[in-house]
Amino acid sequence: MKKKPIIIIGAGISGLTLALALLKNNINVLIFEKEKEIEQRGAGINISPNGTSILYNLGLEKKINSLACKPINIELRNFNNGFLLAKQNLNNSCENKFKYPFFQAQRRDLINILFDEINKINSEIIFFDYELKRYEEKNNFVSVTFDNDKKVDGSLIIGCDGINSNVRKILNPNASSEFSNIIAWRGVVKMNDLSKPITELSPTIWMGNQKHFVHYPVQKGNLLNFIGTVRKDEWHDESWHQFGDKEELKSDFGKANTIIKEIIENVDKPNKWGLFDIKFIKNWASEKALIIGDAAHPMSPSYGQGANCAMEDAIILSRIILKNSNYERNLFYFQKNREGRVKKLQKSSSRNLKVFHIKNPLLKFIIHSGLYILNKIIPIILMQSSWIYKFNA
């Protein structure tokens, strides 16, 4: 008897990566996305060797090389005076040590690469404007109902629907969101609008007082992507993501150096996110339902591992499904397999944010001095991330 398709909720990075991996192995899938079209947000993402290896193994090497940037170096600098605290060769080191390069790209470019590859295999399996309403687990299948009251049956339902996951809400009805007192500003600037000192600068992390700012080129160097995080006491809006006010952005980073000021001055429409912690995500899985990516384990953007972790989830889950003909019974194994690494990534990301945001002058001096001295002796940035980058899903 032919198996019912696996139902994937969400056409983001985790959902599309999972779908592509399964389709390449002749597993039927259906993808349902609540938005009316494929995501077109211009936010930048890091694709470190642990993510690059996945894309290459999916046959996407040429495509990602044609759209993304390979940074030569990365720098850590003081937010106020621009003093260079640490500098690390990135791509030669990554390719020599981990066999795969480090990319920086626009999120929508990666989404479109995955989307186009899926459409080559089957252009009739992605449905837009379908928001999950509920699902019911039956003996041999799962019945899924959408907000348009259409119903679909599948063998499994996989929630790849991000931080506001509807699948997670059903699996974990007691889970609640809590504002982390951090907001993130994002934007892109045309490289032609910026002065030479900025266009020639390596990807840089600027470490300030209860704030930090990161920028790097994307889209083969035609655009500069930035993300800035700052501590806030409250987030009043119902939406976690919205267009931001440029004057508020200037106010949040008002005491910055001239480079950050110029980047902010040239951004057209900045976006801002309230960063929320999701409490009590106890269950990633039931017998026929599973959540992956941000739906299962949201993390702060301060380690640049959100997209990579989502791709890791997708590939590992695809292998579990492929190795078990009765895969409906093996979803619990996924959580057991992934939880340790994910928790370590979340803790490391939170730790990075604390280091980037240090306010105490004495502690800041000690840490900044330590970074400066250690960087002269050992590749401190790469050493800190080695356990992440060497992972091969």
Label for each model-derived stretch:
Residues S14, E37, N164:
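Conserved Rossmann-like nucleotide-cofactor binding loop
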Residues S239-N271, Y327:
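Flavin-binding catalytic cores
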Residues P5, N28, L223-F226:
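Residues at the starts of beta-strands that form the adenosine-phosphate
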Residues E178-I182, I198-S202, T258-G274:
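A short coil-to-beta-strand element that immediately follows conserved catalytic motifs
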Residues L371-A393:
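C-terminal auxiliary extensions adjacent to catalytic cores
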Residues L201-H236, F253, L275:
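Active-site substrate-recognition segment that forms the wall
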Residues K2-I6, S48-K190, D233-K250, A393:
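Conserved N-terminal helical subregion
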Residues A11-F32, I158-G159, W185, H215, ...:
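Conserved mid-domain beta->alpha element of the FAD-binding
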